[in-house]
């Protein structure tokens, strides 16, 4: 953050429209190199030097301005106007430069907003992606209906660029961004396919995620505004939104479109118990009352995406279900509300009564089938869940092989300890344990039984099952901690900030 502030003040001292000149500064690409998300994008492929040239970046930007984009041809995508350069390499360089430049002012605005609101400490506490589950345990047991919503992707990247223009008033920067999308990302047709957008998101993940997050933020800001208009209660949220030109005017215009519905319908059906949570492109909307309001919000969501963001969405893609009969998936868990029925015998004088008590409990379960698919994709087992060896790791030492398997097993235990039923988690540990043994046996060119008998590795491999219990025994008092309690209780670790694919966990 201090580095961002220094570079921003240096740019502000030069001229008022500071974003565009930053594209041509050497330290911007040095900053992108130090924040490359664990992947060295500034190392070219074979046949190129292991460093980039800022002079080549400037030359490519100049050539982008010289291209004629008024004539669109089907053969344009096969032409490479940047002969003599590694186009993919410099495409990633300029993409990272764009992402760094547009991130700088928003990092500073976010920091100043949090300081003014005096919520920096609480903001750090809710950064964990698992902080949502204690909220679900407290609130969802009192709710009856849930809607599982997948936020649709925009059909054209131009929509993402236009949304960003409401935040940053720098015309040359956005003009250069469009030229970049045309030249490097094959954005040379009026209706790009999903495949082209998917390719752009994989080759330029930082820039695409930045643009997509602004799209989601814009959608959520309008949703929160409409919700506040339909309820007299104050909305409590951890979201932080920034002021910008034409922001409220655009919101008010949207309210005028739905003024009839809000004026005559919603005031008679107030619902203070509506809850909304989101992670990445998936959100959950839950309510306590009859599903009338849920259908109303479904109607508003679809019209909001179609009329305001030009994103087509079918009504059948948003389902409304009862929580007691439907399970929803969020952050790698399957969650549903289970009804617990118990009978209590009550005696009053000579009469005896049987009272049936129904209580609700939120069940959060480990999805065993998706996890086995991930293990099979990473070559730890087959599609049926039978453990197999990992020959790729056979060149490492025994200690490194065991440590790799333990690291994956430790991360899975850390992430899924909030499950109410840990039987599936123990099955995953069992698969990893046998895969580790088979990998060691493959390295020593022996059978599993002969390897275990010769090396006596049973005690060492027991760490797959005992390490987590030893850690928890240090946290809880020994007199109150039992293995049975560990199996049944849920433990949420609020230090998990993101989740990686199991395949990339090596």
UniProtKB/Swiss-Prot annotation:
InterPro entries linked: Domain_X (IPR024937), Maturase_MatK (IPR002866), Maturase_MatK_N (IPR024942)
Record keywords, A-Z: Chloroplast, mRNA processing, Plastid, RNA-binding, tRNA processing
Family: Belongs to the intron maturase 2 family. MatK subfamily.
Pfam families assigned to the protein according to its UniProt record, in alphabetical order: Intron_maturas2, MatK_N
Described purpose of this protein according to its UniProt entry: Usually encoded in the trnK tRNA gene intron. Probably assists in splicing its own and other chloroplast group II introns.
Record's protein name: Maturase K
Protein localization: Plastid, Chloroplast
GO terms under cellular component: chloroplast
GO biological process: mRNA processing; RNA splicing; tRNA processing
Gene, per the UniProt record: matK
Keyword Chloroplast appears in the UniProt entry: yes
Annotated source species: Trifolium resupinatum
GO terms assigned for molecular function: RNA binding
């Amino acid at each position: 953050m201090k580095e961002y502030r220094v570079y921003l003040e240096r740019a502000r001292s030069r001229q008022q429209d500071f974003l565009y000149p930053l594209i041509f500064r050497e330290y911007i690409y040095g900053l992108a190199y130090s924040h490359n998300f664990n992947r060295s994008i500034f190392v070219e492929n074979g046949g190129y030097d292991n460093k980039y040239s800022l002079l080549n970046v400037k030359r490519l930007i100049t050539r982008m301005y010289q291209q004629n984009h008024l004539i669109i041809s089907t053969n344009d995508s096969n032409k490479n106007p940047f002969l003599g350069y590694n186009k993919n390499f410099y495409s990633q360089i300029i993409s990272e430069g764009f992402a760094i430049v547009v991130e700088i002012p928003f990092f500073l605005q976010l920091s100043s907003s949090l300081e003014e609101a005096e919520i920096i400490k609480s903001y750090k506490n809710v950064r964990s992606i698992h902080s949502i589950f204690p909220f679900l345990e407290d609130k969802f047991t009192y709710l009856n209906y849930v809607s599982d919503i997948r936020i649709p992707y925009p059909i054209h990247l131009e929509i993402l660029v236009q949304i960003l223009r409401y935040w940053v008033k720098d015309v040359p920067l956005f003009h250069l961004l469009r030229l970049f999308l045309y030249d490097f990302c094959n954005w040379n047709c009026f209706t790009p396919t999903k495949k082209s957008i998917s390719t752009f998101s994989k080759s330029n993940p930082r820039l695409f995620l930045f643009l997509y997050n602004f799209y989601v933020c814009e959608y959520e800001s309008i949703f929160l505004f409409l919700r506040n208009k339909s309820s007299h209660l104050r909305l409590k949220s951890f979201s932080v939104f920034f002021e910008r030109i034409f922001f409220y005017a655009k919101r008010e215009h949207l309210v005028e479109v739905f003024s009839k519905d809000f004026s005559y319908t919603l005031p008679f059906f107030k619902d203070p118990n509506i809850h909304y949570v989101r992670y990445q492109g998936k959100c959950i909307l839950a309510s306590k009352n009859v599903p009338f309001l849920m259908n109303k919000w479904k109607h508003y969501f679809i019209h909001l995406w179609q009329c305001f963001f030009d994103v087509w969405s079918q009504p059948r893609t948003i389902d409304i279900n009862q929580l007691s009969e439907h399970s929803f998936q969020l952050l790698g868990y399957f969650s549903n509300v289970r009804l617990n029925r118990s009978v209590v015998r009550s005696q009053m004088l000579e009469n005896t009564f049987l009272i049936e008590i129904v209580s609700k409990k939120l069940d959060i379960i480990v999805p065993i089938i998706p996890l086995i698919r991930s293990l099979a994709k990473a070559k730890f087992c087959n599609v049926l869940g039978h453990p197999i060896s990992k020959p790729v790791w056979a060149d490492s030492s025994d200690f490194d092989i065991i440590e790799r398997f333990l690291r994956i097993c430790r991360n899975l235990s850390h992430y899924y300890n909030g499950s109410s039923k840990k039987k599936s988690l123990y099955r995953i540990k069992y698969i990893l344990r046998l895969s580790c043994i088979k990998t060691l046996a493959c390295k020593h060119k022996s059978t599993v039984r002969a390897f275990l008998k010769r090396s006596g590795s049973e005690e060492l491999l027991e760490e797959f099952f005992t390490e987590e219990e030893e850690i928890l025994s240090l946290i809880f008092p020994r007199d109150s901690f039992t293995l049975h309690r560990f199996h049944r209780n849920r433990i949420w670790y609020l230090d998990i900030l993101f989740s990686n694919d199991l395949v990339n966990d090596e």
